[in-house]
């Protein structure tokens, strides 16, 4: 009621509805139309009376009254004079709120260039005038004149003249024969006199005729700016301002502090500066002061305006009284503290509180304990309303009093209010959506919030002093969403991987594990029990223990729900757990009839969730939590010093290794091995020793021991903790009871003296010092990691935020091919894991029987996966977000299963944000360091190939010869070994590298694990293909080849050295040739000579004059093995991939199929030409630095996509050469590899969604009949639309190819300028948008949050749809009514306006 009365006297304009926001340059007329008056004086307020000065920065006549409905002099007060303008002080009588919206202006005495369009690179003014920024600044800051009208003189248009040159020109040509200007007036004149249409035409014709790349780029840049101005209707001269707007005074307040001082916004200082200089300049012009003084004043005015708009962009930063830089208008928007990120994207909210959390094990999963005091404060409005409704109070004031006194009826009402009203709990940092969940509050005494133990994993919370925030959803809709979508019981699965996240941890795991142990020779072993009653009785009377081996009957149901019972060999403990399992034929007793480690418990919960649904799972989880806690307590498993068993053999192993290290030291001193080799060998030896000590320790700790009566002793408690997955790991146990082993220095290299002691024995001072070295680095790393990981998440969210599920099915026939990922013979990710929850693109057919396992278009679920794996299928084609053809967002079928729900994804799900969170959230678990591989302590490259299935061998592109030793050697560069099953279907295919020895041939049968081929991982062989005699060319001792003797073995080897470093060797071309029986260079079968060009570091394997047969090695090139390279791992690697950076020494990839030819060498590069098999294509040539290990020979056949030079491929190259699918699989596999190393599960589809966002732009290659310019980057959606239109009109469509953008670049290039500006480089984004007159259609999530609307995802998307339907229905009804009454609206324009949202 009160509100309505207020509204009568205080009418608020209804909020305008709008569909889009446009940004453009403001013309002087526009600025004047906004303004309520000119500000002429720099004064702010009178310091005695605190009244604003007239015509000053806070003038009440211009901006409005200070008090509501009261003029400044006090002549008119009260509501009745509303709208009167006081004749004494000139103030309009109205609300003081208008001081937040009324603007003023300052008329400048001289024009001033807007710094954003001048200095924000690329400079718009510079591009338009085709001048360099330096030259423009010279004119602007009064150093040089610029010729604006050359007339008939020899001067050129836009030529710069210094003061002397200008004087000379005036003397020479006379003053009126030409015009030269200086300062912003000159720039304004030039911009105003530009004929944009003509310039655009000229540029286009010039573009068509030019051939140079650089020139083309420059013209393109200029044409783009010109077109922007033409399309947006902005005028270039508006970039130079004659009038500047002044923002409303309440947005730059001046607040009196006590003690007569004032706190003021920096903007007031900046405006004051501008007004002072402007007034001085006006006075100087009136006084007709000398030119030099006026010029100086104009320059100072330009600098003052620059500082107001963007302080520090040019010249010195202007500082305030306390030497602090003043905050200009640009700074208000920029960065984390700017308007966008501080106030628009992150707001503080009412009805929230925070407190410390404690554990609440007796809560149900959907509950949380809320302190009474907190609840009373949070739910105040609800309590007031209820007190009023029940008649305890008649006014809000009374209700307030009652609540303050905490009367008993208030507590009763609080109980009512809180019932079924969920609250949101949030723990910072909120890294993924499970960081905010809804719970039903239970009132508790005390001041700490109680949290259910099972949700701790999702919040990443522990109880060592963590705090959490509580928020109250107020509206009914918000409560509904909280209950249906955010309730903790609805978030059982992890959105990143689909694995359960409500899983017992720590104590609960320990209790369940203890309960499920089976010991030998326990009392009551071999007894049989009919039901739980008997068993309980036996346990209570201690006839059996929890761990006795018994037989028990387990009751469950069959498919039709009829009760059945089965007898299992089990333990009483497992029977107790089995009692809690929901009765379902798909949930057998076997899943808990085993040692329950954390993994097995997780599997158990997953099975229950899949087959029994959510409600059963929640009940089950709560029950096993209680069971776990109670048995962990009863078991009393503790951590004792004597549980850490130090192996007896430790001393012996260490002594052996010390002897070895001494021996290596001796060999080094004798000069047999190098320093590096010694280091590697010593480190290796200690690493092995450490491993063996650890193995011995584990053996001792694991050992099962029996007491005198033959009963099995209690298991080692540390082992139980570690093995169950409750706490601790073998690595930590090794440090406690084995030896600490090798330590790393901060740079990642390994210190060669290990720490021999363990923590139980204690470290010596030296050892302690060594161990602090690497440990401190670890701490520093952790701090950096958090920031880096957060920044990665922010970039990911920004690039993916507008990816939403918009339609049920796009009907595309494109997709990806999924295969299992195999690494060094191990299957890292099975085909089942990769296709689970995806939609099949084609029918998945069992190769043996021909039956269809999954029909095309169906979701592949757990059952299908079992069938697929059983049938041994190796490739499945699936739909993917990457290939989805929806214009904005993705479709539900391409996305597949919503991992957090286990059902097909809903329309409106913000899959982009979920993907970004899933990838970013584990970021803090990844490492930061670059690995330096030392010795074989880490990985040895794979050097052999084993059959992973049994079957028949088939060799594709067979090219093998038998060498002198009788081995089959691979001579082809793209030979593959396939293994076929009985039905002839391909089970596996392996590429075999050139020079490998191969042990099988076409048609051979192989068993699983049989060796197929092997090769030397550290060298690349050069093989001869013809028989003959070896001859050397240009191999001169000491210049191009040198002999080195390996002293430990006494073997000499000859290697090629850098011959170009000596003047004598500069034109040598070292090579090995094979001569035939006539002494001529032998010819190869495919043409060309048998000549091998050698690169630096190649080791010769044959002597001159030796006889060779095909397949023999003539030389070896040592490769950089994995152990000498620095491997970028962890977070930096993920960031590098998402940013699509080119790696340091990236691979060179062949663009076409063809034959390799060597061209003329070029300085220190080798020229390689690929001659295509397809005669319509042009040959492609590559330049490769000499001395890089390089393994192709003249005449080799090469396939598109093969590596010419090894290294990490650049993602852009993969996209250009092999296409989108290959790029996707490369990025997905590389990123997954980093996460897999840390044991983090992330579903492929999340990475695919991000890659989709990186591939949204098309580079125009041919313009056709479109207005595009070749080289333009255009949005895929827009490109398709333009082409569709052109095709309809029968014109030639534009051509383009997809471009890969890194995530930062992609975020900055989103169609929405609001979203881009709030991400990074705010000034640049806004400058660009203003020049182009961009329109933001508010499609993404971020823009809508910023303008304060519901986001177009989830329920917000549904609401928008409902509104659209409602609007169209209203229109229909109105039309009907109009027709019935037969009255047409008089003016059709009015009818249009009625339904039109304002711009």
UniProtKB/Swiss-Prot annotation:
Q: Name one GO cellular component term.
A: DNA-directed RNA polymerase complex
* Annotated family: Belongs to the RNA polymerase beta' chain family.
Q: Which organism is it from?
A: Chelativorans sp. (strain BNC1)
Q: What InterPro entries is this protein classified in?
A: DNA-dir_RpoC_beta_prime, DNA-dir_RpoC_beta_prime_bact, RNA_pol_asu, RNA_pol_N, RNA_pol_Rpb1_1, RNA_pol_Rpb1_3, RNA_pol_Rpb1_3_sf, RNA_pol_Rpb1_4
- Please state what the protein is called: DNA-directed RNA polymerase subunit beta'
Cite the entry's keywords alphabetically.
DNA-directed RNA polymerase, Magnesium, Metal-binding, Nucleotidyltransferase, Transcription, Transferase, Zinc
Entry keyword annotation includes Electron transport: no
Tell me the gene name: rpoC
- Residues that hold Mg(2+) according to the record: 462, 464, 466
* Annotated Zn(2+) 1 binding sites: 71, 73, 86, 89
